[in-house]
Amino acid sequence: MGIFDYKNLGTEGSKALFADAMAITLYSYHNLDNGFAVGYQHNGLGLGLPATLVGALLGSTDSQGVIPGLPWNPDSEKAALEAVQQAGWTPISASTLGYTGKVDARGTFFGEKPGYTTAQVEVLGKYDDAGTLLEIGIGFRGTSGPRENLITDSIGDLVSDLLAALGPKDYAKNYASEAFGGLLKNVAEYAGAHGLSGHDVVVSGHSLGGLAVNSMADLSDSKWSSFYKDSNYVAYASPTQSAGDKVLNVGYENDPVFRALDGYSSNLSSFGVHDKPHESSTDNIVSFNDHYASTLWNALPFSILNLPTWVSHLPTGYGDGMTRILDSGFYEQMTRDSTVIVANLSDPARATTWVQDLNRNAEAHQGNTFIIGSHGNDLIQGGKGADFIEGGKGNDTIRDSSGHNTFLFSGQFGNDRVIGYQATDKLVFDGVGGSTDYRDHAKVVGGDTVISFGADSVTLVGVSSLSGEGIVIG
């Protein structure tokens, strides 16, 4: 059973659902964090932090910041629409749904009741080639707003965040109905008129949007004529967790918002380290980013009130990192509570920083550790236990510390180096083509052994002889 497996969908069905849910969630933000994401990747959180923040505001020639209408920016709104359409989803308009509430020019739906009017949600459809509606996607947006109303809408959402944590009883649990009760009724009627059931609905969201996902799941038996009781719910970075098993709650362990509440209740740990495991959540996935790696940044307390920790919360980091887990050759070996370290370093930090399990601001990690590299040139260091390491694309350097590790190289994986390889380690080559006999690919160069598959290779540093035991070529 894979780490994101859901209900009885099986591995492939669960992976397809996860990919759909992620595409819908990312679309709900309309690429709002595009400028920060690109600026962070180029400049990082060290000496390049000022340039990263400028990029977040003003963007660049290859990104759009939060300030709209700058002539040198690309159209990230257009890119967001193209991405969700490429994933198979198309926005459904208010007129199509027979809905008369507030909608903006993009087709985004806004909250209905006073106190909820800054909430936003997207409704999308998936169609076959003949134009028949197959599925409906509902994507709740997190704390933010359209670029032109970002400040006022974000303030309204922050009020909702505070009320969810500290306000009236059941505020968070009832959030979806209070904000979008009428719209969700229209969507249910529209779906039913097209021969769909609640099982054909994907509900997704991030941050405050993830809270809305959990809320809707908890209300699905009693609201909207129970239409959504069998829908599929995937929440990212949600501070809350539904009481039942309807929701898959996905987040980074070092995201200060994820699991900030215990169910729907706040406590002192909500404002500090909160790493209590929950049955519905992934509890040990780490975004190994510049903040997590930095001793200096971590001299400050881990807290939802400490803004630098929020780099682990941004939707683009979820889209990239979680998708690499989804695509990993180790996917089926990872369980809901496996320790998974995902490389999300900036380009400057990646050149000098070893990706590893630092176990910061969390309960002690148990069992095997999975380390998933990026598409760049990573430095990856295994621990003392049996680690599963996948460098990904790029020319990676991997340091072996235990002699009981499994290294996975898939497809066109680049030119990697393994330091400290031992005969008790396992090398797995997947989708590389050619002979399955390692002797057809290995040769000694100087004091190293190089295993090559076309233009891709692994250099076992300091290894001058090799046994075929523990080498798998598929």
Locate the predicted segments by residue.
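Gly/Ala-rich beta-loop-alpha elbow adjacent to hydrolase catalytic centers
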Residues: 205-209, 213
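Acidic, glycine-rich calcium-binding repeat modules characteristic of RTX/beta-roll
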Residues: 370-372, 377-438
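Short glycine-enriched nucleophile-adjacent loop
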Residues: 213-221
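Low-complexity acidic/polar repeat-biased segments
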Residues: 439-474
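A generic structural signal for beta-strand entry/edge sites
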Residues: 133-137, 424, 446-450
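A mature extracytoplasmic/lumenal domain signature
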Residues: 142-144, 207, 431-433
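Alpha/beta hydrolase fold serine-hydrolase catalytic domain that processes acyl esters and thioesters
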Residues: 2-62, 74-88, 94-200, 221-388, ...
